[in-house]
């Protein structure tokens, strides 16, 4: 079964420590910040209040993990899993960044350090989706994706959301009607001081849709319904199809 969970792992300069998938499941809905680390959630709440009282807003990040995705979904080029996933995540309003696996840290790794070693699965890792004897990575620095294709290991990454732009704090801008510079422009009304807590279910939904797309593309769900259809949904054609493994 595919299981997906996300949580807020950073608000401004307050960042949660690394937590397990189980901790995300257990704690992320216990607080209004939707952070899976209760102690950090309290600090985030205090920091959000500070910005709200100042009439300002703050950005943050959402961490996600996907388990149960079978190996072999995706393709090396136009149907690369991470490309479709990136498109889905960048479609979430206010998103300014998306990364998976090592993400930006990969820039500091050598090829030898970053390359995941592979082995033959012995059935001893609960988080792996593979049959005994099938090749799987030993580590998961690639975030469950290599060369556009799922490896059977958990897919994980992070989405960055910018601070809400509508704030009551006075700002300098240009008035199109008067063609004058305004030094005290204000947005009047209700203002969200932060977006990641609202973005968690959106990110989870986009993850589910992306995984479902690839399950359909690869004929992993009801293949008899799409075999006779032309184009990318032809399971004889698509690289994700079990027939092409």
Give, region by region, the residue ranges found by the protein language model.
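Glycine-rich, mobile lid/loop segments that gate access to catalytic sites or pores
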Residues: 1-77
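Generic secondary-structure signature for well-ordered alpha-helical cores
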Residues: 1-2, 49, 53-56, 90, ...
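Beta-strand segments within the central parallel beta-sheet cores of soluble alpha/beta enzyme folds
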Residues: 3-10, 63, 100-103, 173, ...
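Glycine-rich and small/hydrophobic secondary-structure elements
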Residues: 27-36, 155, 206, 211
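Glycine-rich anion/phosphate-binding loop at the beta-strand->alpha-helix junction
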Residues: 54-182
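Internal helix-turn-beta structural module
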Residues: 164-245
């Amino acid at each position: 079964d595919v299981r997906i969970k996300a949580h807020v792992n950073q608000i401004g300069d307050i960042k949660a420590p690394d937590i397990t998938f189980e901790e995300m499941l257990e704690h992320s809905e216990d607080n209004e910040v939707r952070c899976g680390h209760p102690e950090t959630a309290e600090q985030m709440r205090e920091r959000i209040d500070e910005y709200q009282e100042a009439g300002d807003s703050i950005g943050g990040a959402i961490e996600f993990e996907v388990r149960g995705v079978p190996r072999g979904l995706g393709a090396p080029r136009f149907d690369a899993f991470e490309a479709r996933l990136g498109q889905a995540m960048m479609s979430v309003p206010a998103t300014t960044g998306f990364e998976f696996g090592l993400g930006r840290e990969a820039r500091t790794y050598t090829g030898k350090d970053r390359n995941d070693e592979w082995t033959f699965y012995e059935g001893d890792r609960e988080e792996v989706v593979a049959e005994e004897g099938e090749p799987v990575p030993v580590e998961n620095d690639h975030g469950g994706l290599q060369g556009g294709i799922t490896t059977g290991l958990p897919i994980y990454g992070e989405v960055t959301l910018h601070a809400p732009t509508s704030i009551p704090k006075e700002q300098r801008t240009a008035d199109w009607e008067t063609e004058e510079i305004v030094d005290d422009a204000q947005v009047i009304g209700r203002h969200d001081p932060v977006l990641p807590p609202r973005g968690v279910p959106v990110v989870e939904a986009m993850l589910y849709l992306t995984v479902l797309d690839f399950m359909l593309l690869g004929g992993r769900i009801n293949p008899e319904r799409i075999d006779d259809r032309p184009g990318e949904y032809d399971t004889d054609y698509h690289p994700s199809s079990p027939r092409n493994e």
